[in-house]
Amino acid sequence: MNEIDIIQQIKSGEVSKMQFKERLLDSYDIGCELVAFSNARGGTLVVGVKDKTGSVNPLSYLEVQETTNTLSNIASENVVPAILVDVETISVDGGSLVVAHIKEGVNKPYHDNRGI
């Protein structure tokens, strides 16, 4: 995926297979998103985009590193059974977006670490 592709998808807005987060503030909430994607047909989580407005708020280099690590931790610790998340970084004006691709799970049903 490149900058042009992701910008076009952002302009189309959130849909069931694509969700936006400005930042990863709530590990439980993100875990629930990953569970939903895994139980459905997969999906994409884009970090660095305001979910209400679709406006891009790029991440700094340090934020990209933290976000990537956080996503990996959530996928392995907050989702049962654990899932793999394919993460890529897309450069945009002023920084980067983290794009996490979650495949449809093969070990359904998935749930969060609280059993929900």
Annotate each PLM feature.
Residues 1-116:
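Conserved N-terminal catalytic/coupling substructures associated with nucleotide/phosphate chemistry
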